[in-house]
Amino acid sequence: KADYALTGNFSTIAYKEAKKYGEVRCAYDGSSLQFSHIPSQDELCLHSDASYFHYCANNTIYGTEWNYIPETNGVVLVSDMSSDITSRVVDISKYGLIYAGAQKNMAPAGVTIVIIQKDLVMKPLDCTPLMLDYQTMIQKDSMYNTPPCWCIYMLGLTMDWLENKGGVEAM
């Protein structure tokens, strides 16, 4: 079971995809407000039996961004940070999994950053595509297949530049 906050296009897509793998519940649905609003903690309908709570940290299409980290009372927190991962300091210890497509602000399209707690890496469902099997990716040092070398190179240059400028803290 999983809880999802629907606050824009990308969280809605993630919600629909997750339904292919198990029971998914809507913890918040902003569609009636044209996704113009990020819910307060009190507006979230979180379930203690959820395996995780998923939210999209920033909604570029609708111009909304979460300005707080949702409190889940021990339920694993998962976030799509594709468009804002390098815009502020993130306490990754509060998350079970963070993922971010690099194409928004880190590198050309083709690279996805995944930060996952080791204890969450387990045997995937039989229907999980191999490219989404984190256990395989970890065992193969993220090189199960030929990686997008130029994109990774550009990501490295961007991260070096960011570090030389003092990191996210200094930006």
Segments and roles (model prediction):
Residues 102-171:
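Active-site C-terminal subdomain of aminotransferase-like
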Residues 3, 52-56, 78, 99, ...:
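Structural motif
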Residues 1-12:
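Conserved PLP-anchoring active-site segment centered on the Schiff-base-forming lysine
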